[in-house]
Amino acid sequence: MSSIRPRRRTLLRALPLALGGAALAPALGACTHASERLDAEANAIPEVDVSGIEEVAELAALVPAEIRERGELVNGAALNYAPGEFVGSDGGAVGYDIDILAAIGRVLGLGTRTESAVFAQIIPAIGSKYDVGISSFTINPERLEQVSMVSYFAAGMSYAVKTGNPYGITPPDLCGTRVAHQVGTYMDEVVVERDEACRADGGQGIIDQPYVGNADAATAVAGGKADVLIGDSPVIAYAVARSRETLEQVGDIEDAALNGIVVARDQPELAEAIRAAVQHLIDSGALREILAAWGNENGMIETSEVDPQ
């Protein structure tokens, strides 16, 4: 896994007053008609049925007695990160992380329950309020000092363009292009850094087009109002999958990092049970099926580990 480098999950921040030197297009105030909008949540959410996944007795035996007797894994998740974990139309938790958790529960003979939480408050509550945290957590040294983490997925930054790539976008070169992205995320910094690099090399700067939501940014690219969409790879992959073939991905996933399921440090038996269940889902093909339903099979890993370095 030497190609996997630490990276943080994109977090929404307050709307910035300025975004560096990149030329700022008036995208935030632009109107998008509902009939044109490529809204992931507005489309039917994938229905993933994990009921056919059978319990594996030798793996279920690894679960600590207290949890096994309770019969349920309690998960803490910040339900604001589609397609990983978000609130569905019925008010319940949905997303590929929620489906993966349910599949892990099937393998271990446990029910699962997800409670909505503030992202920053999940790790401190692991082992007391929550058994696990599966909420698009990037594995990094700082988190590994506090908790154990079981790898199950890889994510990074990726790109999408209008189908056919009419503007000839060749990532990572974005010089002179109109770049659409969701405002208030790590992509704000990416645009500024790329713009500065373009200008330092004597090239054209980036025309920055920030949007309040990723769906509006995707719509701008599909409609030719922007040249390229950038964002976290799970978000971009899901946007492409839901775009009715109006978008396609280009380039490679950059700055790939492992995501991990958070487990308390004093629960090594539970961490090993989770790891073994994830590996079973990898080997059986069930994990790939879940991720494919959400357009994110590119995030597959071959081996699950506890506290990978």
Descriptions of predicted regions:
Residues R8-L12:
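N-terminal export leaders
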